[in-house]
Amino acid sequence: MYIQSLALTSYRNYEHTELQFDNKVNVMIGENAQGKTNLMEAIYVLSMAKSHRTSNDKELIRWDQDYAKIEGRVIKKNGPLPMQLVISKKGKKGKVNHIEQQKLSHYVGALNTIMFAPEDLSLVKGSPQIRRRFLDMEIGQVSAVYLHDLSLYQKILSQRNHYLKQLQTRKQTDQAMLEVLTEQLIDAAAKVVKRRLTFTKQLEKWAQPLHFGISRELETLTLQYHTAIEVSEASDLSKIKNSYEESFQKLRDREIDRGVTLWGPHRDDLLFFVNGRDVQTYGSQGQQRTTALSLKLAEIDLIHEEIGEYPILLLDDVLSELDDYRQSHLLHTIQGRVQTFVTTTSVEGIDHATLKEAEIFRVASGKVID
């Protein structure tokens, strides 16, 4: 798939902009704070219905306007697919093929994108929350069912935490309701964890040979989904539920004392090992960057395996963060397969072969010249 055109209305520092893209490589050149990253973000928001930079949608709306609109014409193997996302202070509404989607979870997945920005290098060394978000965003692109299960889990978790807080402060004394909420939470949690376990194994399958190649055949990358219960990728839903039920029995009194849920996928993590050693703790900066790059490149093949089409790759000021060898490996891996968008302050450092086939856009003060 690829984006043929993009139109922005009142988005960030863009008043109104319409662009036509090359189906291979598009390079956005400009000084910092001119709007390059805003363009990349707009493509990502069109795809995911949320920003990778902020959780406050109001920041996406031009300061003097009431709403922002992103429109794109996506070309897929079955033909063109118009998409539209309107962001207002009341919320977001998405259309796919001119049909308004009742839920954003139905909207997400029509356009698949992979964002690789400097902050993604913290995927390995950052907090578990970053890695959980990575799992949720990437699985959500290929599974609307997962987004539904995750949303349900988060809703029940909030209700359960509220009830635990009431038990803690003696505003409630009936633990029967806690049992009901726990049963519901276990059911939702098991589905979320099962899908994450499967995804982790799929991601490892694609990331392992990539990492081996980038490391000049010196390093073997393995992934582990870390959860407090005894489960594996081979565990079925009933085994996962049984493990959670045992955890609840052990932790119930502590949870009431603390007024919060102490188990579940909202506390899990994704771990990375190179030659058996934890990369986050013991890996060099080079190993951490190779791991992050391998994961991002692996997503391309994983999504292709799941949906039969390659996603769009967004490289936002990340090439300058990679040494020549890793940059060359990245560009060689994607060449000719994936529509790619690159932002940079200068074309220096981007290899000649990539520039030769690229469409060049110059960005300044919210204006784009091609």
Curated annotation (Swiss-Prot):
| Assigned keywords, A-Z | ATP-binding, Cytoplasm, DNA damage, DNA repair, DNA replication, DNA-binding, Nucleotide-binding, SOS response
Any one Gene Ontology MF annotation carried by this entry is: ATP binding
Chief subcellular location equals cytoplasm
Q: What is the lineage of its organism?
A: Bacteria, Bacillati, Bacillota, Bacilli, Bacillales
Q: Which family does it belong to?
A: Belongs to the RecF family.
InterPro entries to which the protein is assigned, alphabetical: DNA-binding_RecF (IPR001238), DNA-binding_RecF_CS (IPR018078), P-loop_NTPase (IPR027417), RecF/RecN/SMC_N (IPR003395), RecF_2 (IPR042174)
Keyword Cytoplasm attached:
yes
**What Pfam families does UniProt report for this protein, alphabetically?**
SMC_N (PF02463)
Q: Name one GO cellular component term.
A: cytoplasm
Q: What is this protein called?
A: DNA replication and repair protein RecF
The job of this chain, per UniProt, is described as: The RecF protein is involved in DNA metabolism; it is required for DNA replication and normal SOS inducibility. RecF binds preferentially to single-stranded, linear DNA. It also seems to bind ATP.
Subcellular localization, as worded in the UniProt entry: Cytoplasm
The UniProt entry, under NCBIfam families, shows: recf
Biological process per Gene Ontology, one example term: SOS response
What domain of life is recorded for the organism? Bacteria
